[in-house]
Amino acid sequence: ERAMQSRVERIVTIAYLSLVKIDRALSRNLADFEAYWVALQDIKALAFDHNLIIKEALVYIRQYVEINPSALFDLLPRKFTASQLRTLYELIYGKPIDVRNFHKKIAMMEYVVPLEEKQQGVAHRAARYYRFDKKIYNKVRR
């Protein structure tokens, strides 16, 4: 708030964009920097044009994923569930995806290989694991 009320005539903002694997923790304690993770929909008004910068970064990520869909799989664990992949799509595109249609879409992706292994120790029905096959992806995408 204080930054928004100041009478600064020029501000230069440098923004860095980084995508982080879902299952990885950051190496430093965010509390040391008074920083914390916030869901996109929960971001409040930021100083200067920082909300616009975040919106433009999200547009860039969406365009990048459209051109290079394999980038999504770099953000997932080596073996992942359909639910994890669907959640990632929903986060990036900001809207819910129909579960049945998404499973059909996965079935058509030759490079998303179903594994025999299923989740263990979960309270719900165990989900099948999948893996991304980069070789098949490269062959299919040519």
Name the predicted role of every residue range.
Residues 1-11:
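Acidic pyrophosphate-coordinating catalytic loop
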Residues 2, 39-42, 50-52, 68, ...:
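Generic detector of short, locally flexible boundary/turn motifs and exposed helical patches
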Residues 2-3, 62-63, 113-115:
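Short secondary-structure boundary micro-motifs
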Residues 3-5, 24-26, 68-76:
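Short helix-to-loop capping/linker segments positioned immediately adjacent to catalytic or ligand/cofactor-binding
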Residues 5, 43-46, 119:
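Alpha-helix initiation/capping motif
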Residues 11-22, 26-63, 75-83, 102-110:
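NUDIX/MutT-family hydrolases
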Residues 67-142:
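Core RNA-modification/binding signature centered on pseudouridine synthases
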